[in-house]
UniProtKB/Swiss-Prot annotation:
Keywords: Conjugation, Periplasm, Plasmid, Signal. One of its GO terms (molecular function) is serine-type endopeptidase activity. The keyword Membrane does not apply. Involved in conjugal transfer of the plasmid. Pfam families: Peptidase_S26 (PF10502). This is Conjugal transfer protein TraF. The gene is traF. Gene3D superfamilies: Umud Fragment, subunit A. The keyword Signal applies. GO terms for biological process: signal peptide processing.
Length: 176
């Protein structure tokens, strides 16, 4: 009798958690567990206008060798985007036609981007090569995060805007 009650409780709890998760996903909520942006619950909001500098966005990266290597190194989580990675949550730092220069930190159109230091190695001591910079091509975005160890366009360069999913709005987030 005791085992049956425990089994019923666990089954009920599993069904409840599964239903809650499904409701959150279909309702446009996502859980961020990466340090590039605050941890916690985020809402997906459809973009009703052209993307702008400063927008915090969800974006699926392209399925390229650079992102495949990033997945192997553990920079990207597994998810439903092409290449089996989760969407990125990043801030749009530059739009097509803007000039990006990458030295020991990032400059966009001659202005220094705050919190954009470039590291030569990751947390495991593996070499990180910065992007070469240049003019952001048409239909591409240069993404940034102020988190020092963020894997963003400093390293992978501009990404196609075709991967843009939505705006990212924090609902219940915190900095650890």
């Amino acid at each position: 009798m005791r085992h049956r009650r425990a089994l019923l409780f666990l089954t009920g709890a599993a069904v409840f958690v599964s239903a809650l998760t499904a409701a959150a996903i279909t309702g446009g909520y996502r859980l961020n567990l990466t340090p590039s942006e605050p941890l916690g619950l985020w809402r997906i909001e459809q973009l009703q206008r052209p993307v702008a500098i400063g927008d915090l966005v969800f974006l699926c990266p392209p399925s390229t060798a650079v992102f495949a290597e990033a997945r192997v190194r553990g920079y990207l989580r597994r998810g439903l985007c092409a290449g089996g990675v989760a969407p990125l949550i990043k801030t749009v730092a530059a739009l097509p036609g803007q000039r990006v220069e990458i030295t020991d930190h990032v400059h966009i159109d001659g202005r220094s981007v705050p919190a954009s230091s470039v590291s030569g190695t990751d947390g495991d001591g593996k070499v990180l090569l910065p992007d070469s910079g240049g003019v952001v091509p048409p239909h591409h975005l240069f993404l940034h995060s102020s988190f020092a160890s963020s894997y963003d366009s400093r390293y992978f360069g501009p990404v196609p805007d075709s991967g843009l999913l939505s705006l990212a709005r924090p609902v219940f987030t915190f900095h650890p």
